């Protein structure tokens, strides 16, 4: 089986971030914490982001050292293996403070990896 291209992993990350934004648009932290279906969906998207980041070539990640790639993978591992201990306020804060800048970078990477082919 052949390895997927970096451009596909970047696209996966982009789509997962867009899904998180969609799932959390127009709600408060309290709304989020009370809606199990919504926060479960968000957590799943973060798991997908972490998996895709883990599959990106190191050469791609080295071009964007301002992104905490290892932290993204570590967060995925926390969500996957410590599900019952997940602090939804931390998830919410990451959505509000870290995800927008990651999204901007992913859009740039997407344009670059798409134009390479």
Model-predicted segments: where are they?
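Solvent-exposed interaction patches of small proteins and small membrane subunits
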Residues: 1-117
């Amino acid at each position: 089986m052949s390895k997927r291209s970096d451009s596909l992993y970047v696209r996966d990350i982009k789509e997962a971030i867009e899904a998180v934004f969609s799932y959390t648009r127009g709600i408060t932290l309290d709304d989020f914490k009370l809606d199990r279906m919504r926060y479960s969906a968000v957590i799943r998207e973060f798991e997908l982001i972490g998996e895709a980041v883990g599959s990106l070539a190191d050469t791609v990640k080295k071009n964007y050292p301002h992104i905490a790639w290892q932290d993204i993978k570590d967060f995925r591992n926390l969500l996957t293996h410590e599900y019952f201990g997940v602090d939804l306020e931390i998830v919410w804060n990451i959505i509000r403070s870290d995800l927008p800048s990651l999204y901007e970078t992913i859009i740039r990477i997407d344009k670059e990896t798409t134009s390479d082919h």
